[in-house]
């Protein structure tokens, strides 16, 4: 386990967009609600309240599918400018307690309060104070996780949702990690989890007891990362004012695909909606300069293609898909990904002065 013990808080707003809508319109509070696009325009759900989640509605789900699961679902369009203003207010609350703030999206952030003198230096009390300030000033709830390392703080913030917090003190880190299901580790998706389970790995203790070289051989970079996490090692620092250069999503298939039609179905129904939501949460106003597609074949050869394009446009991914499939040469496809490259802030400022 890492000997450097810090005080890390992960704050995650509860169903943020939907919560803002319910706050501003009391009639929405007692019914299933989602923020998203219209079903006739092949829209997707950005987020939904907990009432809607009882019916199986989830973010990145096509609106048409969500309405089948929950016919009484009210779907309202997003108000990104409002959400951004609320997010700015939330970050101003964070800054009262520490200057070490790493925003992950409009509704989520890491805070390092190791050297903070607020609340007698107690990370637990600071998390409580932040959540109280958010409620008193914005009438919104937040959940928090407190731990000595980043990944565990993020895991902890999900343990007492909504409107709660969970604290993992240093002396309990390893005991909590040992029983932690691998699907709770950030970065472990459905396909990775299936492969881990096939290897007899279900909780972190299984990984901790495994041979490092064998993990590296079987699972590559993921195996190395899981070995570290399972031993309580996460030396990543809270990065202040991190500028995001790109946003991407990808899907590894349990069964390889081959045809253009299969690829396009994945892009249209899964990847593009997920990318749109991720981009929206990361920074809805930041300019796009490129769109790209990544493809990995059954022989593990990876290829990417990207072209200059200044809008997030589904039709343009169709052109990129046609281009990248020229490199397929009959091979099956095991991974497909979409990405957008964002304009650097400095470049954007320079252009605005011209």
UniProtKB/Swiss-Prot annotation:
GO biological process terms, semicolon-separated: DNA-templated DNA replication; error-prone translesion synthesis; SOS response
Give binding positions for Mg(2+).
12, 107
Gene Ontology MF annotations: damaged DNA binding; DNA-directed DNA polymerase activity; magnesium ion binding
Site (Substrate discrimination): which residue positions? 17
Quote the cofactor binding remark. Binds 2 magnesium ions per subunit.
- The UmuC domain sits at 8-189
EC number(s) for this protein? 2.7.7.7
The UniProt keyword set, sorted, is: Cytoplasm, DNA damage, DNA repair, DNA replication, DNA-binding, DNA-directed DNA polymerase, Magnesium, Metal-binding, Mutator protein, Nucleotidyltransferase, Transferase
Q: Does the keyword Repeat apply?
A: no
Tell me which cofactor or cofactors this protein depends on.
Mg(2+)
UniProt superkingdom: Bacteria
GO CC terms for this protein? cytosol
The record, for SUPFAM superfamilies, names:
DNA/RNA polymerases, Lesion bypass DNA polymerase (Y-family), little finger domain
- Which reactions are catalysed by this chain? DNA(n) + a 2'-deoxyribonucleoside 5'-triphosphate = DNA(n+1) + diphosphate
User: Do the record's keywords include Metal-binding?
Assistant: yes
| Active-site residues from the entry | 108
Q: What class of enzyme is it?
A: transferase
**Xref: PANTHER family:** DNA POLYMERASE KAPPA, DNA REPAIR POLYMERASE UMUC / TRANSFERASE FAMILY MEMBER
Identify its protein family.
Answer: Belongs to the DNA polymerase type-Y family.
Q: What does this protein do?
A: Poorly processive, error-prone DNA polymerase involved in untargeted mutagenesis. Copies undamaged DNA at stalled replication forks, which arise in vivo from mismatched or misaligned primer ends. These misaligned primers can be extended by PolIV. Exhibits no 3'-5' exonuclease (proofreading) activity. May be involved in translesional synthesis, in conjunction with the beta clamp from PolIII.
HAMAP family from the xrefs? DNApol_IV
Q: Which NCBIfam families match?
A: PRK02406.1
**This protein is called what?**
DNA polymerase IV
């Amino acid at each position: 386990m890492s000997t450097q013990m810090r005080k890390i808080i992960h704050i995650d707003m509860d169903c943020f967009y939907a919560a803002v809508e319910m706050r501003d319109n009391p009639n929405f509070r007692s019914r299933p609600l989602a923020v998203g696009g219209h079903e006739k325009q092949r829209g997707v759900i950005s987020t939904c309240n907990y009432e809607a989640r009882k019916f199986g509605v989830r973010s990145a789900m096509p609106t048409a599918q969500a309405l089948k699961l929950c016919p009484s679902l009210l779907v309202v369009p997003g108000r990104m400018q409002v959400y951004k203003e609320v997010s700015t207010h939330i970050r101003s609350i964070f800054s009262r307690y520490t200057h070490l703030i790493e925003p992950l999206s409009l509704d989520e952030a890491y805070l390092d309060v190791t050297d903070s003198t607020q609340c007698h230096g107690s990370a637990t009390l600071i998390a409580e104070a932040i959540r109280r300030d958010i409620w008193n000033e914005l009438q919104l709830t937040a959940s928090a996780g407190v731990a000595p390392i980043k990944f565990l703080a993020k895991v902890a913030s999900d343990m007492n949702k909504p409107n709660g917090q969970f604290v993992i003190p240093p002396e309990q880190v390893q005991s909590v990690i040992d029983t932690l299901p691998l699907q709770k580790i950030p970065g472990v998706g459905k396909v990775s989890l299936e492969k881990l389970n096939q290897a007899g790995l279900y909780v972190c203790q299984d990984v901790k007891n495994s041979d490092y070289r064998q993990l590296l051989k079987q699972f590559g970079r993921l195996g190395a990362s899981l070995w570290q996490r399972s031993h309580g090692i996460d030396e990543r620092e809270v990065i202040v004012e991190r500028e995001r250069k790109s946003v991407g999503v990808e899907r590894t298939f349990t069964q390889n695909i081959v045809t253009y039609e299969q690829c396009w179905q994945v892009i249209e129904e899964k990847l593009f909606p997920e990318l749109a939501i991720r981009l929206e949460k990361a920074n809805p106003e930041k300019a796009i300069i490129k769109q790209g597609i990544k493809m990995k074949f059954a022989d593990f050869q990876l290829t990417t293609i990207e072209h200059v394009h200044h809008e997030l446009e589904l039709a343009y991914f169709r052109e990129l898909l046609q281009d990248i499939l020229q490199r397929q040469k009959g091979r099956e496809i095991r991974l497909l990904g979409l990405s957008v490259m964002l304009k650097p802030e400095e470049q954007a400022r320079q252009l605005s002065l011209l």
